[in-house]
């Protein structure tokens, strides 16, 4: 017979040394409840290390070797990579019977990204370098005066900070701990309060912009269902996130005129899994389990920070004469009212599909620790996707109202309020758009949780 103290010692040694894992507690298992010792609340700390990569391709209209009846041909351009370390302390406190409040503070310790030439592409063949969005010598935000060598063409500034504070409220209409004939069913809402410095890029002073927040407040509604059946514990989680409002310093501003989809896209997610117990000692409150889970997350069309956002901002700086991505702030006035491209762009719908394997342990009635490996893939999608504008109804027709045009046509007229000032035709029109392909991600980390 192995003593409970030895079990605890070995589990702690295994899990605390597994720094290359991503630990997230089963989202449906614990229900904080006001005034009840042992379940009054929980404090947890989650550490994550995330790696992301993608192939960047570019549409090239006019390719003489392409089929004129086929979609615009795409050419390999760049290879994107990014890593991020995140530490998230979280506090759940019971405020009433099976009702609790939550506060979480994600802290990005460091985030770094870079772009290299794709395999088989040299500096003379890269569409991005050919069009002058980056210089032939590349751009190093950490050392702007030194040319980049090899296949490296862009290195961003290391970023860090607090992107948001999450406030939540949850309620469990059913709790298996109280009635073992029923599952545990939870409902909740989380408010994401955007704080901290907004993520911007300044080619003149790159070290002055190290923020990580998008500056957009969001709301997430979620529900989970969990049922422990002997040594098995299946669960499911559904969630929906919608942007609410942007801070005045955020890049997500409505320029008016014919602009559409100026906020980040909504997100719908489904996560499901099963926890399998190898040890489940109800007397000593020790357990050891492995969990298998999967998820599907739908990202709907909207503006966002793509893999190329810093390059777009670099090439759209209105302070640099002749920059190719400078925007026109007022399309109704003659000439160009130069406005810097913010870097964010309209991004096509895409799916994120992932799966994870976790090792979880309970050490006595209060302590939970876990380690998880999470792998995900993102479907190919367009990352420069802004419409040229909107065709307004003809004035005087039924339902036209005051926001109308005098011409009776079905086109977006240049030089009118139909034009979208946020669109950069050089990257947003069909035949010039950027695509993000072969997206892969890996998240590794550990979690510790204490109940009180």
Language model regions located:
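Surface-exposed strand-loop-strand hairpins of Gram-negative outer-membrane beta-barrel proteins
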Residues: 49-86, 116, 202, 208-209
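Outer-membrane beta-barrel biogenesis signature
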Residues: 21-68, 177-184, 435
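Residues that define the transmembrane beta-barrel architecture of outer-membrane proteins
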Residues: 81-87, 159-165, 183, 215-219, ...
């Amino acid at each position: 017979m192995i003593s409970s103290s030895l079990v605890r010692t070995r589990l702690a040694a295994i899990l605390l040394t597994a720094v290359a894992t991503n630990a997230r507690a089963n989202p449906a298992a614990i229900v904080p409840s006001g005034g009840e010792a042992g379940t009054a609340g929980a404090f947890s700390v989650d550490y994550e290390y995330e790696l992301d990569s993608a192939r960047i391709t570019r549409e090239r209209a006019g390719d003489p070797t392409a089929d004129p009846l086929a979609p615009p041909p795409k050419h390999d351009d760049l290879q994107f990579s990014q890593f991020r370390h995140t530490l998230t302390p979280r506090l759940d406190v019971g405020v009433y019977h099976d009702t609790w409040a939550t506060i979480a503070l994600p802290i990005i310790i460091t985030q770094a990204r870079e772009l290299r030439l794709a395999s088989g592409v040299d500096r003379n063949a890269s569409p991005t370098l050919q069009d002058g969005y980056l210089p032939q010598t590349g751009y190093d935000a950490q050392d702007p005066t030194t040319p980049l060598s090899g296949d490296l063409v862009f290195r961003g500034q290391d970023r860090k900070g607090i992107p948001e504070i999450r406030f939540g409220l949850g309620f469990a209409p059913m709790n298996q701990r109280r009635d073992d004939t029923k599952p545990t069913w939870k409902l909740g809402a989380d408010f994401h309060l955007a704080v901290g410095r907004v993520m911007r890029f300044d080619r003149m002073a790159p070290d002055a912009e190290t923020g990580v927040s998008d500056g957009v407040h969001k709301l997430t509604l979620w529900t989970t269902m969990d049922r422990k059946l002997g040594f098995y514990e299946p669960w499911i989680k559904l969630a929906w996130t919608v942007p609410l409002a942007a801070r005045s310093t955020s890049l997500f501003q409505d320029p008016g005129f014919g602009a559409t989809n100026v906020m980040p896209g909504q997100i719908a997610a489904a996560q499901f899994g099963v926890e399998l117990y190898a040890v489940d000692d109800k007397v000593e409150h020790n357990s050891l389990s492995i969990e298998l889970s999967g998820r599907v997350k739908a990202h709907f069309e909207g503006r966002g920070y793509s893999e190329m956002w810093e390059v777009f901002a670099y090439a759209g700086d209105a302070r640099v004469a002749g920059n190719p991505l400078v925007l026109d702030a007022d399309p109704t006035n003659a000439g160009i009212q130069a406005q810097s491209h913010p870097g964010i762009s309209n991004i096509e719908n895409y799916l994120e599909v992932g799966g994870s394997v976790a090792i979880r342990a309970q050490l006595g009635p209060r302590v939970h620790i876990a380690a998880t490996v999470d792998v995900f893939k993102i479907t190919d999608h367009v990352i420069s996707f802004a419409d040229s504008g909107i065709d307004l109804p003809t004035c005087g027709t039924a339902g036209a109202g005051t926001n109308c045009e005098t011409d009776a046509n079905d086109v977006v007229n240049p030089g009118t309020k139909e034009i979208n000032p946020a669109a950069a035709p050089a990257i947003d029109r069909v035949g010039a758009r950027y695509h993000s392909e072969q997206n892969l991600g890996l998240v590794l980390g550990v979690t510790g949780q204490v109940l009180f």
